[in-house]
């Protein structure tokens, strides 16, 4: 693992990009510039229909029985990472009931990811298609993503969109979110409104990235009336659902009192949490707060440690470098140690 070392040379006095801020700013007076939401939305990718095992919502073992149905042993094994068992149980279910759409979808997922079986996107698409014929929304959603990527099926954007529309109509909030990503990418004002409607469906299902993206639209007034208060509420919910981008945006609004009551200490706590989870923007912002003593007690060593962590991810800050240039050799060593310990803990 590459270790971080504090630079010993003179610091170049270059301006840090605003990262979503409008116009110039003085970090000493305003260490957290307002955001228009674009600083946390680079390279958005579609969400898979089935979450990977061991995520926060999928660590409880077998799915509890519903409506008198037996425990779902196949999905339970999948959620625990027992993929061979999941494959065997799903296969047994299909042998007993050739129209078991959920088992077909699970086999498709196992083949798609190469879990418990040799990865085979073509077979995955075949199983998804069989499940989709039984009106399984998750299978439709996965087929849509495969068509968009040309994975296991011919690449076809129109077909991908149709599958996502069908999945959304059958109640998949993940498909609604992915459909919203397609719509927002066209650049048409009408599609922005349609994208907002799809994001709202997913946001209502507590999908964090959808809450973030809908919040950005409210912050910018795209597809919906501009409303920083609604943006703040969506970012807060997204943060509660574990979405780092939402957490950072909510912290920015909290710090500046935009759409929510100004609270620098709470903002600092959100930044610190996101920084600890590896978000470079949060690492930079909490470093600034430690440097000037806003929301947290002034602590140059902590500021330097977080500045190093952000710089290690490509987000340098000439203002921070200059502000912290008077650190002693011992303070620099402590900052390096803290930064490297945090990297190793993630």
Residue map of PLM features:
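N-terminal leader/linker segments that initiate helical-solenoid repeat arrays
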Residues: 20-91, 95-96, 102-105
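Structural signature of tandem alpha-helical TPR/SEL1-like repeats
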Residues: 81-88, 118-127, 154-163, 186-198, ...
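Short helix-capping/linker turns of helical repeat alpha-solenoids
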Residues: 63-66, 70, 77-78, 82, ...
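TPR alpha-solenoid repeat register
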Residues: 103, 139, 175, 210, ...
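Hydrophobic face of amphipathic alpha-helices that form TPR/SEL1-like repeat modules
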Residues: 70-77, 89-93, 104-113, 144-149, ...
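Terminal, low-structured helical/coil segments at or just beyond the last alpha-helical repeat
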Residues: 48-61, 67, 297-298, 311-346
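Bacterial N-terminal signal peptides
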Residues: 8-17
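Conserved structural position within tetratricopeptide repeats
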Residues: 92-95, 129-133, 165-169, 200-204, ...
């Amino acid at each position: 693992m590459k270790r971080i070392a504090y630079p010993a040379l003179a610091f170049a006095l270059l301006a840090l990009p605003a990262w979503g801020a409008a116009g110039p700013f003085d970090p000493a007076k305003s260490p957290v510039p307002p955001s228009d939401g674009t600083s946390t939305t680079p390279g958005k990718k579609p969400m898979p229909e089935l979450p990977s095992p061991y995520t926060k919502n999928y660590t409880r073992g077998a799915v509890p029985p519903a409506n008198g149905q037996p425990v779902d042993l196949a999905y339970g094994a999948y959620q625990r990472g027992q993929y061979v068992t999941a494959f065997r149980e799903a296969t047994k279910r299909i042998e007993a009931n050739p129209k078991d759409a959920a088992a077909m979808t699970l086999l498709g997922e196992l083949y798609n990811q190469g879990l418990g079986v040799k990865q085979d996107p073509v077979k995955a698409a075949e199983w998804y298609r069989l499940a989709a014929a039984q009106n399984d929304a998750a299978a439709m959603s996965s087929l849509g993503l495969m068509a968009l990527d040309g994975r296991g099926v011919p690449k076809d954007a129109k077909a991908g969109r149709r599958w996502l529309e069908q999945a959304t109509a059958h109640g998949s909030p993940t498909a609604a979110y992915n459909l919203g990503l397609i719509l927002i990418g066209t650049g048409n004002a009408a599609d922005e409104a349609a994208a907002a409607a799809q994001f709202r469906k997913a946001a209502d299902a507590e999908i964090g990235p959808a809450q973030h993206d809908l919040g950005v639209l409210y912050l910018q007034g795209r597809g919906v009336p501009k409303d920083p208060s609604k943006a703040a509420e969506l970012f807060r919910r997204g943060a509660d659902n574990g979405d780092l981008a939402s957490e950072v945006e909510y912290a920015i609004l909290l710090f500046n009192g935009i759409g929510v009551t100004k609270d620098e200490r709470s903002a600092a706590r959100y930044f610190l949490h996101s920084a600890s989870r590896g978000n470079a923007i949060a690492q930079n912002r909490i470093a600034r707060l430690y440097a000037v003593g806003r929301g947290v007690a002034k602590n140059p060593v902590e500021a330097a440690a977080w500045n190093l962590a952000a710089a290690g991810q490509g987000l340098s800050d000439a203002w921070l470098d200059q502000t912290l240039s008077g650190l002693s050799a011992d303070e620099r060593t402590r900052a390096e140690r803290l930064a490297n310990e945090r990297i190793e803990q993630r």
